[in-house]
Amino acid sequence: MKKVITYGTFDLFHYGHMKLLERAKNLGDYLIVGLSTDEFNLQKQKKSHHSYEHRKFILETIDLVNEVIPEKNWEQKISDIQKHDIDTFVIGDDWKGKFDFLKEYCEVIYLPRTDGISTTQIKKDMASL
């Protein structure tokens, strides 16, 4: 069984998130999503509209996602890859090159973002209403 992992905040879940998950799942048989905790988001100076538990619930209801694990810090990726026997690490290409160090442990793929939609843009649009 080929296992794939991706990470993200997945706040204000939208079409672009779904396309990322679909493309990630198409690369393997089992998809794990490392979901940023509220505490980790604060460390990154980000604030989610939805709580970790609500974002986790949304992801767990999506058939493409087999498992959701908490992302608590930047450093856990290597241990997650080893613990879950990951074959492929997938993330958006806005992170291109940032996770090349993981190639020692698994395949690393940077997927193109879906044009025209992002959580940041949704938040800006909502703020301007």
UniProtKB/Swiss-Prot annotation:
CTP binds at residues 9-10, 14-17, 46, 113-120. Substrate binds at K44, K77. Belongs to the cytidylyltransferase family. The keyword Protein biosynthesis does not apply. InterPro entries: Archaeal_FAD_synthase, Cyt_trans-like, G3P_cytidylTrfase, Rossmann-like_a/b/a_fold. GO terms for cellular component: cytoplasm. It is found in: Cytoplasm. Gene3D superfamilies: HUPs (3.40.50.620). This is Glycerol-3-phosphate cytidylyltransferase. Its main location: cytoplasm. One of its GO terms (biological process) is teichoic acid biosynthetic process. One of its GO terms (molecular function) is glycerol-3-phosphate cytidylyltransferase activity. Catalyzes the transfer of the cytidylyl group of CTP to sn-glycerol 3-phosphate so the activated glycerol 3-phosphate can be used for teichoic acid synthesis, via incorporation into both the linkage unit by TarB and TarF. Homodimer. Its EC number is 2.7.7.39.
